[in-house]
Regions:
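Cap/lid segment of the alpha/beta-hydrolase catalytic domain
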Residues: 194-210, 218-225, 239-242, 481-484, ...
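Short hydrophobic alpha-helical segments enriched in small aliphatic residues
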Residues: 3-6, 15-18, 36
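Beta-propeller folds
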Residues: 53-435, 439-462, 468-474, 478-482, ...
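Active-site-proximal cap/loop segments of hydrolase catalytic domains
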Residues: 553, 566-766
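Positively charged n-region of N-terminal signal peptides that target proteins for export
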Residues: 43-50
């Protein structure tokens, strides 16, 4: 069997490197999806992921020029007095379990109203006036454009006589699916969505192939919406079949071995369910390829999902021989259930492998054996083995015990080996075991960095993995089953990794917990306590923050003598499930405390100071930004707050946010209301306070985090903050764009240029 592979196309965290991203907020990084042989292609400008997506890097600091080794790129701008009108106040008072809470900008939740659109247009115009006036933008654009031309490539996957993979060349907006017959065969483009829209706003969301490679299913969506339409193409000829199935977001397609049909997940059509539920009620269906009257899938039988909750997330998978159907049901980011069924038994029923406990399980089937990776009573994960004939929990046998390191992502059966990816202090490692759990080899990693994919299945005679680090773009390695690695493809760039130093530092958080952080800068940089620095973090949804190439365009900052800092906060997966749970629900404040402590460490150890420290976060990381700049407005000069959650009392009422209640809680519950109200950024803006300069960035077709968060927070802060014109509160709402996944290179470049123009202006970088 082959697991589902998740990659954020811009970046399973808005997710760099597969963070899913609310990350991949909808996609679950530790997907136990069996032989789905599906690639959720959310390429990588990001890193996770998470999911990722995009994560633009930026931040700002002192308006006075920094005189160290910064070369001329952008100058400070005198914005002059602002004529931007204040937003209308219309207080709505809610009663939360006896607590009266005012909301002065409820009307800005309606993104379709003429008044809201006028507000947005005025804000965008004001933001453009300021950012377009930053000197040196053309130089920034030129360099950032060259950095984005680095491109990307995925690991190849073998399917019958074919190898399939994606690659994005430097100037392309979206990745292209390539196929070749044999590993050394001539490649040809199979699916190129760049031809579908000149501006690149039709995205390749995911793709999936069967064991014989006859057909490939893939999803596309417009304007970053991620509301995929499922298509099928014939691999040998490139002929597009008539199938066109709507509402197939992250469809987790599982092909029958003969490619006569596939299982998949989809969402209901609008009008078929009560309004507001169209983005929930994900269920599993089966589509037969032989029925020309059913190309839209509307006659496809429901296979699984009756009786599930509105926010349960169901996926199907198949063993490589197609004999066993596996259903995985996620309930939040801490729990799933796994069921298995013998498809050859006409009287077969689903058998539960799991027993309803609050753990995660990831399943692989090879032959008649099941391999289960789980954090059951093992926060850093372990591996069990069971027979398909007796799959119940009581019959499992542990073959890889918990260790000091974290089993990352999912273990994979490739050939007659078990490949185990690890995290060691937030850096990737890879080991090869026998199918009985005996270690055969550790695969040497090129440097400290991150695995970005693992290709192969139980019938393969070889494997592939991708690797990336902060200053080194992705390289794909071919791997023998005994652990010998050679380069298969590498992405070239003009960045010399030898010029930069990556160090990992540890510091104490508020409660004494030791927290790590990567710090990247030019070799030989003299630390005088005033170096412009960008600090970024995520800290949520069991997603790891690990090294990725040029995250957020940070190479630009390094080239100008600055520092990039990447902190591994509680709430993530860097140190297992305990680390995750220490930063969720009633313990979410730990995430914010960790980030604040990271900033204080950088200042105390002479990396930077308050006037030269900028911070950046997106999605769940945008919530992080809102929490820390409302709790410690004195600590930062500038903030990039991207696609953020900010009104935590009402977040669950918009888009897909009910899926996140297991991570955050809900104000509808009296106890959980107390947790959320204690830190909800929208409810902690204090009138007369001087805040950092802030650039809120959001998009009109974001189907994960509603733009209302950024609109309301902008209006509130512009009215309340005592900032001068040199510390503006800005809103930038992009059009024909979403949460980040699938954002075309052209739009990514515009995001980067605005972000870094803002940062360099605020940091005083010349």
């Amino acid at each position: 069997m082959h697991p589902t592979h998740s990659q954020l196309i811009p970046s399973e965290r808005y997710v760099p490197h597969g963070r899913d991203i609310l990350c991949n907020d909808l996609i679950i990084w530790r997907d136990s999806n069996i032989s789905v042989r599906s690639v959720f292609n959310f390429e990588v400008f990001m890193r996770f992921a998470l999911p990722a997506l995009l994560i633009l890097a930026a931040a700002m600091v002192s308006a006075q020029p920094h005189s160290s080794e910064l070369s001329s790129a952008a100058g400070t701008t005198d914005p002059g007095p602002s004529s931007l009108p204040r937003a209308r106040v219309a207080i709505v008072t809610d009663d939360y379990h006896g607590h009266k809470v005012d909301d002065p900008y409820r009307w800005l939740e309606d993104g379709k109203s003429a008044e809201t659109q006028k507000f947005t247009d005025e804000q965008n115009t004001h933001t453009r006036q300021l950012l377009d006036a930053v000197t040196g933008r053309d130089k920034l654009r030129a360099r950032l454009g060259r950095l984005l031309e680095t491109g990307s490539v995925s690991v190849p996957y073998d399917a019958g006589p074919y190898y399939l993979y994606t690659r994005r060349e430097g100037s392309q907006n979206q990745a292209v699916i390539y196929v070749r017959e044999g590993l050394k065969g001539k490649e040809r483009a199979l699916v190129d969505v760049n031809a579908l829209a000149a501006d690149g706003t039709i995205a390749l969301d995911w793709w999936s192939f069967g064991r014989n490679g006859k057909y490939l299913a893939y999803g596309t969506s417009p304007n970053g919406s991620e509301d995929s339409t499922l298509h099928v193409i014939e691999t040998a000829t490139g002929r597009l079949l008539p199938e066109k199935i709507e509402h197939a977001r992250s469809a987790a397609v599982a092909w029958l071995p003969d490619s006569s049909g596939f299982y998949y997940s989809r969402y209901p059509r609008p009008g078929d369910v009560p309004a507001g539920q169209e983005r929930y009620l994900r269920r599993v269906y089966f589509h037969a390829m032989s029925d020309p009257s059913n190309i839209d899938g509307l006659k496809d039988p429901l296979i699984f999902g009756d009786g599930l909750g509105i926010d349960d997330w169901a996926n199907a998978g198949l063993s490589d021989d197609g004999c066993r159907l596996v259903i995985t049901i996620y309930s939040g980011w801490t729990k799933n259930e796994v069921l298995i069924k013998d498809r050859n038994d006409p009287n077969g029923r689903f058998i539960k492998l799991t027993d309803g406990r609050n753990f995660l399980y990831s399943v692989q089937i090879a032959g008649d054996q099941i391999y289960i990776t789980t954090n059951e009573d093992a926060p850093r994960y372990r591996v069990f083995k069971a027979s398909c004939a007796r799959p119940e929990r009581k019959n499992w046998k542990e073959i890889i015990a918990p260790s000091a390191d974290i089993i990352d992502q999912v273990t994979q059966v490739i050939g007659n080996r078990l490949f185990v990816p690890w995290l060691k202090n937030a850096g990737s490692a890879l080991s090869i075991y026998s199918l009985e759990g005996k270690k055969i080899a550790d695969v040497p990693m090129p440097t400290y960095g991150s695995l970005t994919g693992l290709g192969g299945y139980s019938g393969s005679k070889e494997a592939f993995f991708g690797f990336v680090s902060y200053a080194t773009p992705i390289t794909i390695y071919h791997l023998t089953l005994d652990g010998k690695a050679t380069v298969w493809q590498s992405i070239q760039s003009d960045v010399d990794p030898g010029r930069y130093e990556v160090r990992q530092v540890w510091f104490n958080s508020k409660d004494g917990t030791r927290v790590p952080m990567f710090v990247v800068h030019k070799k030989g940089l003299k630390l005088d306590g005033t170096t412009p620095t960008l600090l970024t973090g995520y800290g949520g949804f069991n997603i790891s923050q690990t090294p990725s190439f040029d995250e957020n365009g940070m190479i630009l900052l390094l080239e100008h003598g600055g520092i990039f800092a990447d902190v591994q906060l509680r709430g993530g997966a860097e140190f297992g499930e305990d680390w995750h749970r220490a930063g969720m629900l009633d313990k979410k404040q730990n995430t914010f405390d960790d980030f604040i402590a990271a900033a204080e460490y950088l200042i105390a150890n002479k990396f930077t100071d308050k006037d030269h420290l900028a911070i950046q976060g997106a999605s769940n990381g945008g919530l992080l930004m809102g929490a820390v700049f409302t709790q410690r407005p004195d600590l930062f000069r500038a903030v990039l707050c991207q696609v953020p959650l900010l009104d935590m009392l009402r977040y669950q009422n918009f888009q897909i946010a009910k899926l996140w209640i297991p991570e955050y809680g809900s104000s509808e519950d009296p106890k959980q209301f107390e947790w959320l109200y204690a830190y909800s950024p929208y409810h902690h803006v204090k009138e007369g306070t001087v805040y950092p300069a802030i650039l809120f960035m959001t998009a009109d077709t974001d189907t994960r985090v509603d733009p209302m968060h950024a609109r309301k927070m902008t209006a509130l802060m512009q009215a309340a903050a005592a900032n001068g014109a040199d510390r503006p509160i800005l809103l930038r709402l992009d059009t024909k764009a979403g949460h980040g996944a699938g954002k075309p290179r052209g739009k990514v470049l515009e995001d980067y240029v605005d972000s870094w123009s803002f940062v360099f202006w605020q940091l005083g970088v010349k």
